Amino acid sequence: MLEKYKNSKKLSRDLPQINDRIKFPKVRVIDDEGEQLGIFAPEAAIQLATKQGLDLVLVSDKSDPPVCRILDYGKYKFTQEKRAREAKKKQHNSSIKEVKMRYKIEEHDYKVRINQASKFLQSGDKVKATITFRGREIQHSNLAINLLNKMAADLVTIAEIQQAPSRDGRNVIMLLSPKKVN
């Protein structure tokens, strides 16, 4: 029994503030054409909305007084959901893909890594190029930096350097991001 009560309380907080759910002493009212009608008590604004066969919907509670709009709530909710779906379609979650290699890499292996990185960049992901060292190889970190600069030069048509080659412990790291298409 207690479980139902908790859930019902949570649901009532998530409900949109329309008509009788608006609990402010005064609200600024905008009609369905977008014209300001003035500041009203919520009861008077609700009567005005019901005369037109529409709903009073709280648009912004951050301003003083809160802004309410007279509109068809069903249509308003549909357009909000449609906008959210469109925004979700356009959104691309770019993740960071890593390409690892050693500073003594052979030419063919290097080309394979370049191809991997270019595929990642073309799909809109960022690429973290990492060169790892073992033992005393760390003395040759300048060779690794030169190799990463060569990689950036080979990918200059599709990528831009977001983080220049730098040492990070036993690694040298560079971060590339896809170029913005205008």
From Swiss-Prot:
A GO CC term assigned to this protein in UniProt: membrane
Localization per Swiss-Prot or TrEMBL: Plastid, Chloroplast
Keyword Lyase among record annotations: no
Keywords, ordered alphabetically: Chloroplast, Initiation factor, Plastid, Protein biosynthesis
Pfam families noted in UniProt: IF3_C, IF3_N
Record-level Gene Ontology MF annotations: ribosome binding; translation initiation factor activity
Any single biological process term in GO: ribosome disassembly
SUPFAM superfamilies xref list: Translation initiation factor IF3, C-terminal domain (SSF55200), Translation initiation factor IF3, N-terminal domain (SSF54364)
Subunit structure: Monomer.
Family statement: Belongs to the IF-3 family.
General function of this protein: IF-3 binds to the 30S ribosomal subunit and shifts the equilibrium between 70S ribosomes and their 50S and 30S subunits in favor of the free subunits, thus enhancing the availability of 30S subunits on which protein synthesis initiation begins.
PANTHER family noted in UniProt: TRANSLATION INITIATION FACTOR IF-3, TRANSLATION INITIATION FACTOR IF-3, MITOCHONDRIAL
Name this polypeptide is given: Translation initiation factor IF-3, chloroplastic
